[in-house]
C-alpha cells in the first residue's frame, strides 16, 4: 500500500474518532441540559447536581425506559406471543426500583408493572455508562432494594417473602458470567434468607457491617430493622436461613429507601406524582418521623433508592417508566449529587 493511501486511511480513522467523540459529548450535553431544566423546581438538588459535575461519570441511563427491552415472559399470553412472532419477548413496562454501586459497576433492578415478565437486573459500567448485560431474576419480585457487599463481592436484593422480610444474594462473578436472558432460564440465587421482625422487605441498605431493611407503609408508618450481615463461607456452608434484628425503629409513611453517612441517616420519602423528599436524621435517631427529622429537602417525584458513595449521593427514579412517564417530569438516568453541598 502506498504512503498516500496509508495517510488517507489514517486521516479517515482520526476523523471518525473525532466524530464519535463529538457525538458522545453532544449527547452528554443534551442530557445535562434536559436534567438541569427538570431540576429548576428543586434548587437544593440542582445545586448539589451542579457541584458534582466535575466528578460526574458518564450519563448513567436506565435501560428499558424509552423503548422496550428484551425480557422473559411469565404469563401464558406473553409466552404465546413470543412463540407466534418468533422473536425474543419485549417488555415496555419495566419499572426501576433498586440501586447498588460497586467499584466498577452500577446494578439496577426492575419489575414488570404489567406482571407479564420476570424481574430483571441491569449491570452498567460506571466509567462509560454502557449497559453491559441484563440478568433475569426468578419470578416477579418488586426488588425494591439492592446492596453490594464489597468485602465478599456479593449483591444482596429484596425478594417476596411470606409474613416476614426476605433477601437473596448472588456473587458478582456469577452475575458477570450469567446468560439467563439468552437461555430464558432465570439466574439461581446463592442464598435466600428470611428477616424476622418486619412483615416484608420493601427496601435495603447497608451500614457498619449490617443489612438494614424496612417496610413501605402508606398510612400507618413502617418499621426499619438492622441485621448482622450474613456470612457466606467459602466452604459452601450457607448462612442461617432466618436472622433476627439487632434493633428496630419506627418510620414515617411512604419510605422508599434509606442510606447512611458517618453522621446521618438519609430517608427517601415518595409516593405518586407529588414531589418527593429526602429527610435527614441523626444516625442514632430512634424514631424516624417528621418531628425528629433535622432537615427535609424537596426532590423530584418518584424517587426510589438512594446510595451514598464516596461523598456523592446516587439517586434512582421510576418516573421514566412506562406506567408514570405520561405524568410529566420523567428522569431517565441515575442522578449523582454532591452530598456535602446537598446537606450544607
Report residues per predicted region.
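A short beta-strand motif characteristic of beta-propeller blades
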Residues: 79-90, 130-136, 188-195, 239-249, ...
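Short coil/turn segments that connect the beta-strands within blades of beta-propeller domains
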Residues: 103-104, 151-153, 208-210, 262-264, ...
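Loop/turn-rich, solvent-exposed surfaces of beta-rich toroidal or solenoidal domains
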Residues: 247-283
Amino acid at each position: 500500500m502506498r504512503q498516500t493511501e496509508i495517510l488517507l486511511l489514517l486521516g479517515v480513522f482520526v476523523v471518525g474518532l473525532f466524530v464519535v467523540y463529538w457525538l458522545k459529548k453532544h449527547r452528554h450535553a443534551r442530557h445535562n441540559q434536559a436534567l438541569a431544566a427538570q431540576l429548576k423546581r428543586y434548587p437544593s438538588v440542582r445545586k448539589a447536581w451542579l457541584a458534582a459535575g466535575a466528578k460526574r461519570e458518564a450519563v448513567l441511563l436506565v435501560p428499558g425506559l424509552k423503548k422496550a427491552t428484551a425480557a422473559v415472559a411469565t404469563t401464558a399470553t406473553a409466552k404465546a406471543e413470543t412463540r407466534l412472532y418468533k422473536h425474543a419477548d419485549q417488555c415496555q413496562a419495566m419499572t426501576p426500583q433498586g440501586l447498588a454501586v460497586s467499584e466498577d459497576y452500577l446494578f439496577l433492578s426492575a419489575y414488570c408493572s404489567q406482571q407479564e415478565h420476570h424481574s430483571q437486573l441491569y449491570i452498567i459500567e460506571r466509567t462509560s455508562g454502557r449497559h453491559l448485560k441484563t440478568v433475569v431474576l426468578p419470578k416477579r419480585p418488586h426488588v425494591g432494594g439492592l446492596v453490594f457487599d464489597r468485602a465478599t463481592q456479593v449483591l444482596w436484593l429484596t425478594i417476596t417473602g411470606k409474613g416476614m422480610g426476605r433477601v437473596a444474594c448472588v456473587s458478582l462473578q456469577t452475575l458477570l458470567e450469567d446468560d439467563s436472558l439468552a437461555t430464558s432460564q432465570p439466574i439461581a440465587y446463592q442464598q435466600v434468607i428470611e428477616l424476622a421482625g418486619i412483615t416484608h422487605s420493601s427496601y435495603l441498605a447497608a451500614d457498619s457491617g449490617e443489612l438494614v431493611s424496612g417496610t413501605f407503609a402508606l398510612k400507618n408508618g413502617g418499621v426499619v430493622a438492622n441485621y448482622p450481615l450474613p456470612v457466606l463461607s467459602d466452604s459452601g456452608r450457607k448462612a442461617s436461613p432466618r436472622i433476627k434484628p439487632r434493633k428496630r425503629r419506627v418510620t414515617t409513611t411512604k419510605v422508599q429507601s434509606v442510606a447512611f453517612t458517618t453522621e446521618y441517616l438519609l430517608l427517601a420519602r415518595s409516593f405518586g406524582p407529588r414531589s418527593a423528599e429526602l429527610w435527614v436524621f441523626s444516625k442514632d435517631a430512634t424514631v424516624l418521623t417528621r418531628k425528629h427529622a433535622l432537615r427535609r429537602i424537596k426532590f423530584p417525584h418518584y424517587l426510589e433508592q438512594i446510595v451514598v458513595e464516596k461523598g456523592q449521593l446516587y439517586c434512582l427514579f421510576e418516573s421514566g417508566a412506562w406506567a408514570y412517564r405520561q405524568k410529566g417530569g420523567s428522569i431517565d438516568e441515575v442522578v449523582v449529587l454532591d452530598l456535602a453541598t446537598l446537606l450544607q
